[in-house]
From Swiss-Prot:
One of its GO terms (biological process) is spindle midzone assembly. Keywords: Coiled coil, Cytoplasm, Cytoskeleton, Lipoprotein, Myristate. It comes from Xenopus laevis (African clawed frog). A lipid is attached at residue 2 (N-myristoyl glycine). GO terms for molecular function: microtubule binding. The gene is ccdc69-b. May act as a scaffold to regulate the recruitment and assembly of spindle midzone components. It is found in: Cytoplasm, Cytoskeleton, Spindle; Midbody. Belongs to the CCDC69 family. GO terms for cellular component: cytoplasm; midbody; nucleus; spindle midzone. This is Coiled-coil domain-containing protein 69-B. The keyword Coiled coil applies.
Length: 301
């Protein structure tokens, strides 16, 4: 930028030198005329000093123009540097937003996949528990039916005992010992009945105890699995709530970053416009001053 200004100023200097040389020609003629007319050298020396002062002023203005153009070039470089830095920061912010968006999408996909797997496991466990419950219900119904059948069988056996064993024993007792008294006859019948009843009850109770023991074990196992499933379901709900909170927080952070990025972008664009306006004013002012300085020596000469 400085070299261009120097090229612009050099023709002007050469023009001024030619004008000076042209003027110096007549000045030499005037000097000869003055010598011819016997005038003093003081006026000639004064004009030479004025020309030297004019040359120094031109050189000083040229140096000031070079300094102004160098400052304008420096301001332009600084403005472009700020624009590049703002663009780099904008790119970094965009990359950060993109990375956060990808992380949020990945986390959401993982959470949905985990929730789907847990939901599938929950449905399978629920189906298994429903099947087990149905099996237990069927088993209990079978037990009830079996108990009813055993009760009917027991009543039938009781009837047969009354009709067979007691009658046979009673008849044998009568044949062996004769007819007993009414009291002993009743006692004997009661004794046989109680013995048969106790034996049947003991056997039936033993069977029922075994079945109830097996049923209780299966019920306890079912309750334990139900509690485990409920705990896993609660843990799943808590984890889902945490994942939801994390997703909401990430969404809020992403929105905040996007808002900040938009503000920074708007601010960078505003700064860039201000820099361009200031640079434009500075360049226009320097050019105007340059033309003024270039015209001034001609007017003086």
């Amino acid at each position: 930028m400085g070299s261009k200004t120097s090229k612009m100023c050099c023709p002007q200097l050469r023009k001024k030198k030619r004008q000076k040389a042209h003027k110096e020609g007549p000045s030499s003629q005037e000097l000869n005329d003055l010598n011819a007319k016997s005038q003093g050298p003081n006026e000639l020396l004064q004009k030479i000093k004025e020309y030297e002062q004019e040359i120094r002023n031109i050189l000083q203005k040229h140096q000031e123009e070079k300094t102004a153009l160098a400052d304008a070039h420096k301001a332009d470089v600084e403005a472009r540097t700020l624009v590049l830095q703002a663009q780099a920061q904008k790119d970094r912010d965009a990359e950060t937003v993109k990375l956060l968006s990808e992380q949020a999408a990945t986390m959401k996909a993982e959470m949905e996949e985990m929730f789907a797997e847990l939901q599938k496991s929950y449905e399978q466990e629920k189906s298994s528990l429903t099947e087990i419950h149905q099996q237990l219900t069927d088993a209990l119904q079978e037990s009830v039916d079996e108990l009813n059948s055993q009760l009917a069988s027991f009543r039938e056996k009781m009837k047969r005992v009354e009709e067979s064993i007691l009658s046979q024993d009673y008849q044998r007792h009568i044949q062996d010992y004769g007819s007993p008294g009414q009291f002993w006859e009743k006692e004997l019948q009661s004794l046989h009945f109680v013995i048969e009843m106790k034996s049947e009850l003991i056997r039936e109770q033993d069977k029922r105890l075994q079945r109830h023991k097996s049923t209780m074990e299966r019920s306890l196992e079912l309750e334990e699995r139900s509690r485990t499933l409920q705990q896993e379901n609660e843990a799943l709900k808590v984890q889902t709530q945490k994942q939801g909170a994390i997703t909401v927080r990430l969404s809020e952070e992403l929105l905040s970053i996007q808002t900040t990025l938009e503000k920074q972008t708007h601010r960078c664009e505003q700064l860039e416009r201000e820099k361009e306006q200031n640079l434009y004013r500075a360049v226009i002012g320097d050019i105007t001053q340059q033309f003024s300085l270039q015209e001034l020596p001609v007017m003086v000469l």
